[in-house]
Amino acid sequence: GTFADVSEKSGILKSPGTYGLGVIVFDFDNDGWPDIYVANDSTSSALYKNNHDGTFTDIAIESGVAYSADGKPQAGMGVSVADYNADGLFDIVKTNFAGDTSSLYRNSGSGWFEDQTFQAGLGRITRFLGWGASFLDFDNDGWADIMLCNGHVYPEVGETAAESGYRQRKVAYRNLGDGKFIEASESLGPGVMEKAPGRGMAVGDFDNDGDLDILVNCVNDVPQLLRCDSSTKNNWIKVKTVGVK
């Protein structure tokens, strides 16, 4: 097969002058059609609603995911989606530049997202420059937790009260199951606390032991592969599919 560039025809080129750094495809309104969210740096982010005819419409502003809770554009870097409050709807977590918090948008189901960054407990940490973001259930309790990889863009940046230096540790939030999160970075071992110039992250069970592992790619450095050795008694399921001719 071949690919044709339909960017302009589809309508996603109608937002010039933006700096998209993170993107994810998901069905935010459960209509069976994939939509697109773009985390933009220094400008409003975009939520492209699928019009079911090969075109998209940016509805980020009216949906509440274009700006921060106080109406300011943020320097979005990475993005992930999951149903963190188990209501059947995809929610959004977004990393931002240093001096700002990450963003957590809860899907209300009515076409509107509510900024729950501070209410959920993600509004206290601002020293890190976030890149990769992943919803993942790192303790297999059935609730989507959050992992963020970080690293500054300027090697000369030193560690201060406001900045965490060039090489930065990961930040992990444990989902308490009541709409709130608590930072759990230190409890997850030295691999999470090890500092690196992180730029992106992927999650998967690479050793097939039932818990999720993390791969962090770094700029001008080797990647980090963090194997999860869980001591939890919680459950997981493995499915083997068999093809039929």
Q: Residues of each region from the PLM?
A:
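Acidic, glycine/proline-rich Ca2+-coordinating loop motifs
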Residues: 1-245
